[in-house]
């Protein structure tokens, strides 16, 4: 039974990483389509770089997101001391997502907000045995807000004159 629980945990972590990496590439592509009046059908291939800048940035953003989830996320997830490390680390990452708005051009609020929310979900799952349920809920809320603000900046960058 323990092996299944560990597998479920890892599945949630990597699902969060995949969703976050996809969003970190998707929303800038939406902004690019709106900026150049391209066809919305181009979103079907949002992972495919459209220019030389994209050839560098798309793989870089994906690799950095996976590395962040792999290092920080796994470290927080594998808390053996029953202190609900995912809740604490998730909240810190969510706050970094809010501050990351200053670095929106590398999708920092989306990446850190996604990691914070993912770790917050794991923290909420552990709250009955390890405590810190409120901190986990805050990680989810702040992480989701940072994620949403990062996405909104990309989608509405032109209207915001960014």
Range-by-range predicted roles:
Residues 5, 68-86, 118-138:
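Cytoplasmic membrane-interface segments at the C-terminal ends of transmembrane helices
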Residues 88-119:
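Hydrophobic alpha-helical transmembrane segments of integral membrane proteins
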Residues 46-51, 64-80, 99-101, 156:
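Short juxtamembrane and helix-loop transition motifs at transmembrane-helix boundaries
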Residues 19-64:
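Hydrophobic transmembrane helix segments
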Residues 12-24, 91-96, 143-146:
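Alpha-helical transmembrane segments
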Residues 3-18, 134-142:
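Alpha-helical transmembrane segments and their helix-start/interface "positive-inside/aromatic belt" motifs
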Residues 1-6, 35-40, 80-98:
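Hydrophobic alpha-helical transmembrane segments
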Residues 146-162:
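Juxtamembrane boundary at the C-terminal end of a transmembrane helix
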């Amino acid at each position: 039974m323990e092996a299944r629980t560990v597998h479920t945990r890892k599945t949630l972590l990597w699902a969060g990483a995949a969703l976050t990496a996809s969003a970190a590439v998707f929303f800038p592509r939406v902004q690019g389509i709106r900026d150049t009046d391209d066809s919305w059908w181009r979103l079907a291939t949002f992972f495919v770089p459209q220019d030389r800048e994209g050839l560098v940035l798309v793989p870089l953003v994906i690799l950095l997101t996976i590395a962040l989830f792999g290092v920080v996320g796994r470290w927080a997830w594998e808390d053996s001391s029953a202190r609900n490390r995912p809740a604490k680390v998730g909240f810190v990452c969510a706050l970094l997502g809010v501050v990351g708005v200053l670095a929106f051009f590398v999708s920092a609020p989306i990446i850190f907000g996604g990691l914070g929310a993912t770790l917050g979900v794991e923290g909420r799952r552990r709250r009955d045995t390890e405590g810190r349920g409120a901190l986990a809920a805050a990680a989810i809320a702040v992480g989701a807000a940072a994620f949403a603000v990062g996405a909104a900046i990309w989608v509405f960058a032109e209207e915001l004159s960014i």
